[in-house]
């Protein structure tokens, strides 16, 4: 198997290292501690064993088997030990974990082999094959199924054809298992045939077809099995699960009725449900596409085979074979659709054609007749099996052009029994051919890699088994197969004479790997010496039906038999047909030719015990398998040069932590080439020069111990970092919890009421721009909540109303609120009375609340089915009145008033999808009396903002335009950002406790009382007006030289002058977003695009604005505040005068004179609002105190700038 290659990551390629020799390639990712790493059991790759021997391999496999690790690598070869239990390692989660992963990234697994094969096929357009070998019961079939499962899962494709191909490929497993598998002493589900499944893919890696080639079906099992073994599964499935139709048509009875299924005294198997598996077989036939007629034909042949076994013969008076039960002959003839006399003649009469050309009919004895009977059954089953495989191939034929393929070979492993015959010779011959492929591809690839990488190495000596393959298959000089054919040709009429002739040919062969013995011969295979018995071997090689049976098939009335046996019998043709040896040689060479065109992967399966126990590990038996599978040779070949080799990039990615020159705090810091980085790592880890070599693209490590040392140092690196990682992890948990809380808070604010907002927007479409709107109806904060009274609640006032009026549990309230109904008064004008309006999914309720005997009584005054409402009448004005046009002959239509009318209409449209009819006109129509329509006028003459009904008319005011839509949702009150300080990942004041980056250029103003003279002198002082400066200086007393000497040796600098007055407060300007017409005297009319000044802001949605000489209120949602320009920086003041010299040369100024009585001192400049003559401690310190607004804004700005920058990693 070739090395799994991975294409360069395009995303990572963009982050290439600039300037280094490795520029253009992705740098290694930051290293992370493998917290979920599972402790290794033994070694996962046998090439890493310190001592290579069969016993050491066996011990390592035993450790891993007992630790529930059944897979082990030998380089790229996978060794699999059958666990005889479900380890839970084939789930979808495990399968997904291997997708897109390199073999070295994950533990050994059959999915890794499948991923490697599929990836190389797709990425590099190489045909792939997976060769699975091992003895019966070692898990070959299971491994093949898992590879098919993985490829079907990862190969993609959503089209119907591709999914159908996948289903059919998976359906081949139960179908071929039922016809090709059987219970043996060593395996309850042993494959008694070999198969090579090729899955064909298109150019994008989607399966578009498949084909199957079968090898070496053990057809002798049809007619006989040893005790406690079974025939093929299908016979027991069919006899136990056949339908009544089949039982009547084909005479199917229980398996104990038939000799072929009951002779071995084993009808049932633990863990196998024949009835359930028969249904799986039938389902697989349907998936693959077998018609009912084809299925009937298949089961007819199976029934014929079963009844063939019940033909029993006895000797007649002349010693020839005679049938015991004629009824069996007649029923078998019925199944085969031939004449009963012709059938019995074909079995009991042998047709001989000597060299003279004369046709001789020779009666058969009992033994010969039984042999012919069994030959008939074996031929029927063998040809039926071949037809099923061919039929599967027809269904799986590619339906579009193919690009590449992945092949799966599941075939017998070496068989060495006490008595070995022709079957074992064929099986072991095929395994020799596969071993030859393994040697040529694996060892040759190893040698080519050393030459390509220019590595100094010792040439590997190995046994080339080509000499053994030639011994078996050669034509000149003749090999074993040719000798078998020649012996049959020489003495074809006498099997014993054929065997003797063949043995003479074997004795005449000269080959170091062939040892003739008396009645047998030994071939030295690569897996061990095998002694083959000569008795009967030539007869098995002929593998021919008698011409009488072939002639009977040609005259059968069953067309399916003609399909199974298409060849016409030429009685005059005495040319010898191809033998079984010829066919297996041709098939094996074709298989080798196919595999040589592919990139192979190998799976060696091992059976741990003979008892199918999940805990038993039979050391001698496994050791025997290790020897004949050649695992030790595989390890030695892999280790002959170097035990470990890896590309420079991957080596650096794995071990860059071990050198301080290539890493810092888990980050890759090397700026040079990857090759130089490898040398630096090996140098810093003190690996001797003789333990490694540098190739052209790879680094080679000589011994496994060196690799173990590197891995140990890498693991210890993380142990040394454990404390720091734990601390950071706990901090991260606190940080994550705080972040999650903030995200949840934001999400709740964002999502709350979203569906109500959508419903509100739908309300505009319900009105269709035909009705004027109220200003409050189109506010941005308006939501259509629906059930305002809580009628759907389980408790509270709403539940009390629901129970009082009897709303059923199957009714859901979609709208409820308080409104009014127009009640007619006798002799005077109608009057609006309060009511509760409820809309459910089926009815419209008008609920009245009355006080009866001091108790509130709630009754449903009207309960109108929604289907009875013919129309809803409303005016085009902004009023809230509407009518329900019911047209009842007994009651008048209700005329209602509801301030949430638009929402009510919207909810009613939802529950009345087919019958909702909203009539909007200049007036409102309704039946004031049954059958008598009346028109209610709507007049826009009301000085009152509230609508009212009077004298048959509704009086209202002018509303918003009918095409008005809801205003944008007003923005929430801005909240200053607050950094997450939980977990100490971000500390107050900036990351890592340092001052926030946004405040580094801001110089704090020290308090004058605590500053030294030099500090004060060095601080820039804002400039002041000369007059103010002189006035301030005149008011400050100055010490004399004597005073300075008595108090302190240092001279205190005079305090700085006060800062300049703050600039005038900037105007707040806003831009008008929408037109607004003022309805009242204190409301300002504005137009879109105007700029206005905001004088005052209120939290009720209205701002006091000023435009020119007009000052009035405007809606806050209609304007957008403009960002203000930063205030100008005040000009700096001149520095204070220098302190007087201490040497007395400069005469000090005299103290200021006190003001004369009755005179006021000169007035000072007004002080800045930020100055205070009274400090917070009660002193008369003039420390400048910045205003609260400016300091808060500055702090928020600094914090925001600190949060916006990346986290500082110096904490590491």
Curated annotation (Swiss-Prot):
Entry binding sites for ATP: 134-141
One GO BP annotation of this record: actin cortical patch localization
Keyword Nucleotide-binding: yes
Chief location of this protein within or outside the cell: cytoplasm
Segments of skewed composition (Pro residues): 1053-1062, 1125-1140
A Pfam family per the record: Myosin_head
Disulfide bonds: none
Record's signal peptide: none
Keyword terms, alphabetized: Actin-binding, ATP-binding, Cytoplasm, Cytoskeleton, Hydrolase, Motor protein, Myosin, Nucleotide-binding, Repeat, SH3 domain
Biased composition (Polar residues): 954-966, 1171-1190
Keyword Repeat: yes
Function: Type-I myosin implicated in the organization of the actin cytoskeleton. Required for proper actin cytoskeleton polarization. At the cell cortex, assembles in patch-like structures together with proteins from the actin-polymerizing machinery and promotes actin assembly. Functions as actin nucleation-promoting factor (NPF) for the Arp2/3 complex.
Record text about domains: The myosin motor domain displays actin-stimulated ATPase activity and generates a mechanochemical force.
Protein name per the record: Myosin-1
Species of origin: Pyricularia oryzae (strain 70-15 / ATCC MYA-4617 / FGSC 8958) (Rice blast fungus)
């Amino acid at each position: 198997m070739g090395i799994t290659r991975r294409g360069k990551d395009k995303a990572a390629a963009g982050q290439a290292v600039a300037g280094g020799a490795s520029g253009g390639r992705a740098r290694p990712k930051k290293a992370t501690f493998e917290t979920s790493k599972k402790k290794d059991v033994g070694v996962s790759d046998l090439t890493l064993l310190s001592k290579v021997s069969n016993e050491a391999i066996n011990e390592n496999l035993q450790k891993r088997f007992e630790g529930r690790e059944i897979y082990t690598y030998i380089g790229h070869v996978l060794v699999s030990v059958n666990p005889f239990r479900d380890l839970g390692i084939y789930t979808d989660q495990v399968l997904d974990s291997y997708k897109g992963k390199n073999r070295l990234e994950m533990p050994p697994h059959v999915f890794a082999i499948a991923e490697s094969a599929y990836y190389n096929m797709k990425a590099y357009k190489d045909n792939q094959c997976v060769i699975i070998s091992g003895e019966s019961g070692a898990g070959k079939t299971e491994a093949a199924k898992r590879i098919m499962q993985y490829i079907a899962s990862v190969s993609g494709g959503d089209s119907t054809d591709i999914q159908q191909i996948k289903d059919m490929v998976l359906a081949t497993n139960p179908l071929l298992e039922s016809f090709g598998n059987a219970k043996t002493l060593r395996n309850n589900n042993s494959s008694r045939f070999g198969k090579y499944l090729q899955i064909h893919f298109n150019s994008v890696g989607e399966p578009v077809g498949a084909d199957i080639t079968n090898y070496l079906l053990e057809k002798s099992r049809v007619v006989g099995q040893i005790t406690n073994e079974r025939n093929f599964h299908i016979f027991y499935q069919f006899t136990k699960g056949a339908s009544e139709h089949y039982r009547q048509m084909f005479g199917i009875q229980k398996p104990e009725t038939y000799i072929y299924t009951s002779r071995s005294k084993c009808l049932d198997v633990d863990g196998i449900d024949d009835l359930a598996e028969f249904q799986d077989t039938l389902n697989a036939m349907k998936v693959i596409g077998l018609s009912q007629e084809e299925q009937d034909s298949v089961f007819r042949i199976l029934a014929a085979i079963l009844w063939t076994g019940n033909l029993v013969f006895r000797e007649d008076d002349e010693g020839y074979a005679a049938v015991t039960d004629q009824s069996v002959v007649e029923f078998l003839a019925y199944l085969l659709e031939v004449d009963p006399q012709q059938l019995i003649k074909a079995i009991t009469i042998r047709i001989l054609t000597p060299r003279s050309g004369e046709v001789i009919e020779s009666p058969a004895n009992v033994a010969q007749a039984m042999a012919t009977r069994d030959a008939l059954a074996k031929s029927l089953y063998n040809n039926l099996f071949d037809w099923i495989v061919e039929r599967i191939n027809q269904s799986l034929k590619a339906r579009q052009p193919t690009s590449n393929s992945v092949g799966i070979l599941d075939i017998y492993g070496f068989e060495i029994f006490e008595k070995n015959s022709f079957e074992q010779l064929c099986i072991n011959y095929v395994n020799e051919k596969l071993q030859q492929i393994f040697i040529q591809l694996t060892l040759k690839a190893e040698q080519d890699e050393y030459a390509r990488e220019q590595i100094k190495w010792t040439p590997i000596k190995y046994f080339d088994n080509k000499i053994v393959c030639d011994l078996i298959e050669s034509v000149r000089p003749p090999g074993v197969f040719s000798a078998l054919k020649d012996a049959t040709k020489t003495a074809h009429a006498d099997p014993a004479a054929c065997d003797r002739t063949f043995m003479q040919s074997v004795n005449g062969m000269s080959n170091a790997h062939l040892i003739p013995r008396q009645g047998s011969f030994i071939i030295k295979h690569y897996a061990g010496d095998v002694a083959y018995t000569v008795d009967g071997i030539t007869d098995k090689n002929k593998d021919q039906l008698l011409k009488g049976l072939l002639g009977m098939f040609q005259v059968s009335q069953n067309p399916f038999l003609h399909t199974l046996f298409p060849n016409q019998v030429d009685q005059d043709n005495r040319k010898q047909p191809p033998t079984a040896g010829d066919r297996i040689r041709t098939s094996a060479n074709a298989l080798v030719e196919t595999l040589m065109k592919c990139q192979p992967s190998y799976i060696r399966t091992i059976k741990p015990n003979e008892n199918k126990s999940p805990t038993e590990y039979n050391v001698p038996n496994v050791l025997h398998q290790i020897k004949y599978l050649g695992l030790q040779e595989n390890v030695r070949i892999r280790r002959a040069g170097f035990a470990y080799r890896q590309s420079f990039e991957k080596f650096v990615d794995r071990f860059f932590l071990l050198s301080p020159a290539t890493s810092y705090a888990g980050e890759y810091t090397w700026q040079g080439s990857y090759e130089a980085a490898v040398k630096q790592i090996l140098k810093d880890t003190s690996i001797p020069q003789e333990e490694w070599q540098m190739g052209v693209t790879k680094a080679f490590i000589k011994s496994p111990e060196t690799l173990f040392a590197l891995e140990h140092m890498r693991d210890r690196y993380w142990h040394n970092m454990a404390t720091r990682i734990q601390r950071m992890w706990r901090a991260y948990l606190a940080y994550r919890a705080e972040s999650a809380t903030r995200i949840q808070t934001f999400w709740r604010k964002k999502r709350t009421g979203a569906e109500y907002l959508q419903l509100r927007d739908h309300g505009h479409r319900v009105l269709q721009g035909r009705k004027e709107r109220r200003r409050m109806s189109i506010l941005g904060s308006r939501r259509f909540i629906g059930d305002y009274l809580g009628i759907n609640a389980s408790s509270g006032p709403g539940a009390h109303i629901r129970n009082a009026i009897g709303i059923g549990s199957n009714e859901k309230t979609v709208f409820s609120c308080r409104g009014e109904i127009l009640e007619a008064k006798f002799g005077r004008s109608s009057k609006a009375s309060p009511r509760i309006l409820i809309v459910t999914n089926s009815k419209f309720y008008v609920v009245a609340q009355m006080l009866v005997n001091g108790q509130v009584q709630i009754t449903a005054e009207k309960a109108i089915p929604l289907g009875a409402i013919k129309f809803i009448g409303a005016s085009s004005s902004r009023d809230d009145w509407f009518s329900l046009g019911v047209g009842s002959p007994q009651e008048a239509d209700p005329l209602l008033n509801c301030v949430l009318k638009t929402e009510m209409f919207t909810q009613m449209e939802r529950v009345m999808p087919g019958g909702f009819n909203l009539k909007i006109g200049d007036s409102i129509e309704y039946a004031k009396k049954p059958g008598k329509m009346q028109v209610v006028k709507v007049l826009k003459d009301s000085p009152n903002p509230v609508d009212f009904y009077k004298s048959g008319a509704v009086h209202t005011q002018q509303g918003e335009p009918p095409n008005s839509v809801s205003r944008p949702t007003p923005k929430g009150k801005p909240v200053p950002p607050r950094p997450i300080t939980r977990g100490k990942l971000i500390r107050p004041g900036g990351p890592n406790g340092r001052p926030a980056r946004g405040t580094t250029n801001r110089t704090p103003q020290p308090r004058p009382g605590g500053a030294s003279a030099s500090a004060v002198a060095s601080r820039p002082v804002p400039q002041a007006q000369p007059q103010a400066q002189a006035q301030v200086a005149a008011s400050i007393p100055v010490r004399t030289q004597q005073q300075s000497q008595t108090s302190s040796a240092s001279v205190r600098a005079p305090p700085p002058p006060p800062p300049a007055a703050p600039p005038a407060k900037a105007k707040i300007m806003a831009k008008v977003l929408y037109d607004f017409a003022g309805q009242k005297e204190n409301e300002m009319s504005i137009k879109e695009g105007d700029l206005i000044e905001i004088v005052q802001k209120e939290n009720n949605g209205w701002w006091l604005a000023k435009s020119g000489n007009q000052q009035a209120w405007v809606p806050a949602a209609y304007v957008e505040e403009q960002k203000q320009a930063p205030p100008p920086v005040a000009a700096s003041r001149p520095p204070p005068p220098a302190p007087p010299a201490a040497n007395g040369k400069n005469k000090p100024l005299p103290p200021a004179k006190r003001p004369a009585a009755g005179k006021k001192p000169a007035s000072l400049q007004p002080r800045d609002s930020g100055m205070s003559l009274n400090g917070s401690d009660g002193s008369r310190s003039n420390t400048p105190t910045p205003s609260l607004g400016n300091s808060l804004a500055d702090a928020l700005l600094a914090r925001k700038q600190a949060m916006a920058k990346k986290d500082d990693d110096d904490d590491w």
